[in-house]
A protein has these predicted regions:
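A conserved beta-strand-loop-helix scaffold within acyl/acetyltransferase catalytic domains
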Residues: 1-21
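Alpha-helix termini
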Residues: 4-7, 38-52
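A short acidic, glycine/proline-enriched capping/turn motif at secondary-structure boundaries
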Residues: 21-24, 63-65
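A generic structural motif
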Residues: 18-23, 124-127
C-alpha cells in the first residue's frame, strides 16, 4: 500500500556514526554515510519489486529543548558541539520533521526521551507522507527500541501519525548557528529552557 501510493521502496534508520576524536575532520563520517547509502542502494537494486524512493531517518538531539547543562554535557561526551553536528547533518540532506517526536523508554524503569528530533533525507519535497513515517516508526520502535517491553507512548505516537496526512520537513544550517549563539550567551545560561528565547519554537533560516 505504501509502495504503490507513494513510490516508497524502503526506509532506513541510522543509529550512530562513531568517529574517534583524534580522527575527526578527516571526512571519515561523510565517507561512512556515503558508503551506507551506496550499500543500501546496491542491496535494494537486487530486487525488481524494490523500486522507488528511499527515506532515510536518524534521531538527533533538539538543543532548544535542552538545558545548558544537558547541552554542554552532551557536547563533552560527543566531542562535538550539538549545533555543529546538526548543521553537518543538514548539509548532508537530513532535515528535521516538524512534530513533537520522542523516543519511547528503553526499559520498563526508564522514561521516554523527549529532547530528540527525527530527521529525514528524501529525494525531494518539503513534506513526508505520514503513512510512511508511521510504518517506519512502528518497525523501529518495536524492533529496535521497545524490544521485549511495551509502553503506551509508542502506540499513541504511531496512532497519532495515522490521523495525519503529511509531516512538514524543516531546517537550515543558519538556524543551528543562531541556536548555538544563544547557548554561549550569558542570557542563555540563566534562562531555561532555551525555547523561551524564541518567539517561534521552529524558526528556520
Amino acid at each position: 500500500c505504501v509502495k504503490k501510493k507513494y513510490d516508497c521502496r524502503a526506509t532506513l534508520h541510522i543509529h550512530y556514526i562513531l568517529v574517534r576524536g583524534e580522527y575527526r575532520s578527516l571526512g571519515i563520517a561523510s565517507r561512512l554515510l556515503n558508503e551506507m547509502e551506496r550499500s543500501a542502494d546496491a542491496w535494494l537494486a537486487q530486487s525488481e519489486c524494490l523500486r522507488g524512493r528511499v527515506f532515510s531517518f536518524c534521531e538527533q538531539n533538539a538543543p532548544e529543548l535542552m538545558t545548558s547543562e544537558e547541552y554542554f554535557t552532551d557536547c563533552l561526551h560527543a566531542r562535538i558541539d550539538q549545533c555543529d553536528r546538526l548543521a553537518w547533518w543538514c548539509k548532508k540532506g537530513y532535515n528535521r520533521l516538524r512534530f513533537n517526536y520522542f523516543q519511547p523508554s528503553l526499559s520498563e524503569d526508564a522514561k521516554a526521551c523527549t529532547i530528540l528530533t527525527l530527521n529525514v533525507k528524501q529525494a525531494s519535497g518539503t513534506q513526508v507522507p505520514a503513512l510512511i513515517l508511521q510504518e517506519h516508526l512502528r518497525r523501529f520502535f518495536y524492533i529496535s527500541v521497545l524490544k521485549a517491553h511495551e509502553d503506551g507512548t509508542a502506540s499513541r505516537l504511531v496512532g497519532w501519525l495515522g490521523t495525519q496526512n503529511r509531516i512538514e520537513v524543516e531546517g537550515r544550517p543558519a538556524f543551528y548557528k543562531r541556536l548555538q549563539k544563544s547557548f554561549y550567551s550569558s542570557e542563555a545560561v540563566t534562562r531555561r529552557p532555551l525555547s523561551l528565547l524564541f518567539d517561534e519554537p521552529n524558526v528556520t533560516g
